[in-house]
Amino acid sequence: MTYSDAIIKRITSLCIEKEITINKLATLSGITQSTLNSMINGETKNPKLKTLRKIAMGFNMTVSELLDFPEMNELEFEDE
């Protein structure tokens, strides 16, 4: 699993858990729908920390909480 795959999995699972759509998350996060869609579709391979912070805020959590999940903690980083 790549870094971007792990981020996509985390965002989609949190949307399911919190019962919000990707569109609603974009609104709550203050980012454009196209930016979030690019991430979810794997077009954005390395999202900026600023974007991750906004997404975390949309979920009402910190960046640390957003990135603290088993797949990310077990990920061995390689050049993508």
Q: What is the meaning of each model-derived region?
A:
Residues M1-T21:
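A short, Lys/Arg-rich alpha-helix, primarily the initiator
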Residues I11, L25, L36-M39, L66:
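Conserved hydrophobic/aromatic packing and binding residues within compact polymer-binding modules
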Residues C15, A26, A56:
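The alpha-helix within a helix-turn-helix
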Residues I31-N46:
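Recognition helix of helix-turn-helix/homeodomain-like DNA-binding domains
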Residues S38, L67-E80:
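Short, charged recognition helix plus adjacent turn
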Residues K50-E65:
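DNA major-groove recognition helix of helix-turn-helix/homeodomain DNA-binding modules
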